[in-house]
Regions:
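Active-site region of glycoside hydrolase catalytic domains
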Residues: 2-109, 125-143
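Mobile cap/lid helix-loop segments that gate and shape the active-site cleft of serine hydrolases
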Residues: 111-123
Length: 143
């Protein structure tokens, strides 16, 4: 049933800290955050599946730190096990990708042409998502 898709968290992060939005490999707080979010994703999947009924088969979005593309690709983000669906991938990876940043988020509105460099950045990002998740049977939702 695709009428309802659960998302347990939206942009979970270390609010107010230096690496609130950016992942720094090896940074103690970043690594602790990733481990905590991995645990929370497991708890969310378990809680939803244990309610029974259609929730045993519904799609669930799981996310990395800050729902960040960078964190999700480069950290120790893990997709939790889904024992209710061992032969079907019912967990979807959720990432927010504000890229190319200069084109989509920069306050200078004069940057309004989609350049080959911007295209290449998106291509590389999509390629990384493909190699890490889609190639392994997981779907990705980009917000």
């Amino acid at each position: 049933d695709h009428h309802l898709i659960f998302e347990g968290m939206n942009e979970p992060r270390m609010v107010g800290l230096t690496n609130e939005w950016w992942y720094l490999s090896g940074d103690k707080l970043c690594e602790e955050s990733v481990a905590t979010i991995n645990q929370l994703n497991k708890l969310i999947v378990t809680a939803i599946r244990e309610t029974g009924g259609n929730n045993k088969k519904r799609f669930i979005l799981v996310t990395g730190h800050a729902a960040s593309f960078d964190y999700t690709i480069n950290s120790k983000f893990e997709i939790p096990a889904d024992p209710e669906n061992p032969n079907e991938k019912r967990l979807l990876v959720s990432v927010h990708m504000y890229a190319p940043y200069t084109f989509v988020m920069h306050p200078d509105m004069s940057i309004n042409k989609f350049t080959p460099e911007f295209r290449n950045e998106l291509y590389q990002n999509f390629k990384q998502l493909y190699l890490k998740f889609i190639k392994n049977g997981y779907h990705v939702v980009i917000g």
